[in-house]
A protein has these predicted regions:
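Conserved ABC ATPase signature
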Residues: 78-82, 86
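Single conserved hydrophobic/aromatic residue that forms the stacking wall/gate
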Residues: 1-9, 13
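Conserved catalytic motifs of ABC-family nucleotide-binding domains
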Residues: 99
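Catalytic Walker B motif of ABC-type/P-loop ATPase nucleotide-binding domains
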Residues: 103-106
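A short, surface-exposed alpha-helical micro-motif characterized by mixed small hydrophobic
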Residues: 145-147
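Conserved ABC ATPase "signature" region
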Residues: 55-73
């Protein structure tokens, strides 16, 4: 069989070295991905193996570090002295420094506090908008997915069971629950309000969008 990646229709098996730099992956546990003496060296590993000049490597390292919120003083520390959130950002910086066409993130917010989660998700959204590349987010957090995903692939026992726009997938809440998943909590609350006769539209997936809709409604009812 022939496996193709992107519209260039390159044969993956014949051009493995070139293809490796088209896809970057951040593991769920970044400490397994970090290995160099300093954060700077860790981030520079990918660009170095791409054959970039030292000047280009330095540029990519600092671009990736700035993008992920890694301060200059952290670049020369051991990655193993970082906090959990800092390790996560360092691991992501090391991958995006290669400027991959496809960025794969495996449970990127696992173990982060609410603030760290919000910051990381915002960075992922901004990265996608600025670079206009493909970002694949592997997650069991429906709230995270609702915030960042345009389309959702649902797998069950290694089989594809759904592939559609985010709102359309979450509209199939009963089917999701049967395979052990759930719709975002706020979406479920809005669904319950509709069942009680409140004129609430479908497709509200985040707390922010729920507040935007309900606040004028509540003010009107309070008069």
């Amino acid at each position: 069989s022939t496996l193709m990646l992107s519209s260039a229709a390159s044969d993956v098996y014949k051009r493995q070295r070139k293809i490796r730099f088209k896809v970057g992956m951040v593991f769920q546990y970044p400490e397994y991905q970090l290995f160099e003496e300093t954060v700077y060296k860790d981030i520079s590993f990918g660009p170095f193996n791409k054959g970039l000049s030292q000047e280009e490597i330095d540029k990519e390292v600092r671009r990736a570090a700035k993008f992920t919120g890694i301060k200059d003083e952290l670049l020369y520390k051991s990655p193993f002295d970082l906090s959990g959130g800092e390790k996560r950002r360092a691991a992501i910086a090391g991958v995006i420094a290669m400027d991959p066409d496809v960025l794969v993130l495996d449970e990127p917010t696992a173990g982060l506090d609410p603030m760290g989660r919000d910051v990381l998700l915002s960075q992922i959204v901004r990265y996608h908008k600025e670079r206009q590349n493909t970002v694949l987010l592997v997650s069991h957090s429906m709230e995270d997915i609702a915030r960042v995903a345009d389309r959702i692939v649902v797998m069950n026992k290694s089989k594809l069971v759904m592939f559609d726009e985010t709102q359309k997938v979450f509209a199939r809440g009963d089917e999701l629950e049967k395979i052990g998943l759930r719709i975002p909590q706020i979406t479920k609350i809005m669904s319950q309000l509709r069942k009680r006769g409140v004129d609430v539209p479908e497709g509200i997936l985040t707390v922010d969008s729920a507040v935007d809709y309900l606040l004028p409604f509540i003010k009107k009812e309070a008069r």
